[in-house]
Amino acid sequence: MTDKTFLVEIGTEELPPKALRNLAESFAANFTAELDAANLAHGDVSWFAAPRRLALKVARLSASQPDREVEKRGPAISQAFDAEGKPTKAAEGWARGCGITVEQAERLTTDKGEWLLYRAHAKGEQAQALLAGMVSTALSKLPIPKLMRWSDKETQFVRPVHTVTLLLGEELIPGQVLGIHSARTIRGHRFMGEAEFTIDNAEQYPQILLERGKVVADYDARKAKIKADAEDAARKIGGNADLSDSLLEEVTSLVEWPVVLTAKFEEKFLAVPSEALVYTMKGDQKYFPVYDNSGNLLPHFIFVANIESKDPQQIISGNEKVVRPRLADAEFFFNTDRKKRLEDHLPRLETVLFQQQLGSLRDKTDRIQALAGWVASQIGADVNHATRAGLLSKCDLMTNMVFEFTDTQGVMGMHYARHDGEAEDVAVALNEQYQPRFAGDELPSSAVACALAIADKMDSLAGIFGIGQHPKGDKDPFALRRAALGVLRIIVEKRLPLDLQTLTEEAVRLYGTKLTNTKAVDEVIEFMLGRFRAWYQEEGHSVDTIQAVLARRPTRPADFDARVKAVSHFRSLDAAAALAAANKRVSNILAKSTDKLNESVNAAVLKDAAEITLATHLVVLRDKLTPLFAEGRYQEALVELASLREPVDAFFDQVMVMAEDEQVRVNRLTLLSQLRELFLQVADISVLQ
């Protein structure tokens, strides 16, 4: 039998748009794993996904599993027969499990003994007998947080299922998947093409669906068409479409037959901050905003219809009518909010809870104000501006605009602060206090904004750890992992002279008697050092490089960064492996020794040439290294320390460390201790593999 193309399509009601790609990719990965586990040879596995279907197409699927030889070793002959030569119960049970009698078993003889052996030729199963079950298994493993039941069925899936098609070439594979019998029926677009049609051969998919059903099943092709058509539409009106990938993905998952159209709104709405308008267009309506070449919002938007209309203007007008009330709301909120100063919203923050044990948002504001001022004093920022930004930091949460359009928090604070005549760096800080919001996001641009962003995040870390509610597993309701990494990124990338120890102590101190966890400072620092580990692993640094630095527990993030980069560079040196091994050896020797070491090496006690040479090198190096360590020039320091390879190797080759003479032994141990201490000024390189 020849290899054939296999098709599975699951026809559903509208699938969750934000999960569609993940569902399809997981389906393909799961089914591929099932094929491989069943030893069914196959070619490429392609996936297709549209709002009402998930499908896979497998090229060159083998018609059956390969035949195989089966061998099962039974009990040893000594255990298989009793003294009279009769089969024991163990032998009979084994034979029964193999479907034979003991007498039919073969014997396997090796140099270790003799055993009963069952050998058979197992014929591979036909693919058609396996496929329905494999599809069901692959679907059952999809990442679906909430399952649905429908009708009177016990079956559960992400959305109700109406059709299942399993085709191997031209052959319909019988069976049930998700309670639905396999059939040749394919459903087309809801309003275009044929509502239902039959498919004769797996090779016809997805072209038959495109031609007869008016559905573009190829997800990436659909996405590419939307992107290209939207870019073209924007060019025609002299603009550039905001085609953020997340929205492009969502829109792709909402339509089966994409038709890109351009609409407009009244220019008067451009007086409203563009962020609020864009929030409405992108978040609520799934429209693509359009900007001019200077980055200014144009009074146009691009949207994607799911139908090819004879009168597209009617669809355009309908969308313009839908968005106008939302833009009018934004205009009203903006004008209403500006009748009050931002500071006037402070009293209302007392009515909003930050956390039951930690008080209101007004309490948090007071702490942020104080901590932002403290941070500003440490990093050379304007303390008055930082404290002012801290005072106003949460006021915009009480405005009508932010209440209605939650994602505009921060940015609306900036606009309202400018309207009130606040200093520009104060206004900008209100917007940038939440940065970085995600991996790769921009950092706050000014020192005042950095002070506010650090204060806001550290207040949350100190408070939540202070009441013993640190993140556990994948539960992190206060987004403390993101907050910790944000603080570290700001300090490291802005090269700020902040120490996590004093920073955390100040954040905890500002809570007064509210905190119950006496270990909060240490736990916050350990948590943040753990975030360092995750961050640097993603940056490509090896685990043991990071561990070497963590062993020293440096609490100044900029210093930590310099050490990691220094150790990574050190590893590229020829001497690195030998010196890491030597440090490990020194560490073990010192750990096992019970001798009390001297404060310094006694030159008069040095005997062997190798130990004299090493001691001399250490004296010279110590003078060179002292200013390098003081200035945090760790890479230069480790390059200098690499010069110790030859004297260290010679020392271990020629010198007996644990000499019988106590004075000599202690002097040599002291020498090794001083060697190790020099390396420990940077990191514990003994952990390097």
Swiss-Prot record:
An annotated Gene Ontology molecular function: glycine-tRNA ligase activity
Biological process, per Gene Ontology: arginyl-tRNA aminoacylation; glycyl-tRNA aminoacylation
Pfam family, one: tRNA_synt_2f
InterPro entries: DALR_anticod-bd, Gly-tRNA-synth_bsu, Gly-tRNA-synth_heterodimer
Subunit architecture: Tetramer of two alpha and two beta subunits.
PANTHER family per record: GLYCINE--TRNA LIGASE, CHLOROPLASTIC_MITOCHONDRIAL 2 (PTHR30075:SF2), GLYCYL-TRNA SYNTHETASE (PTHR30075)
Name recorded for this polypeptide: Glycine--tRNA ligase beta subunit
Organism annotation: Pectobacterium atrosepticum (strain SCRI 1043 / ATCC BAA-672)
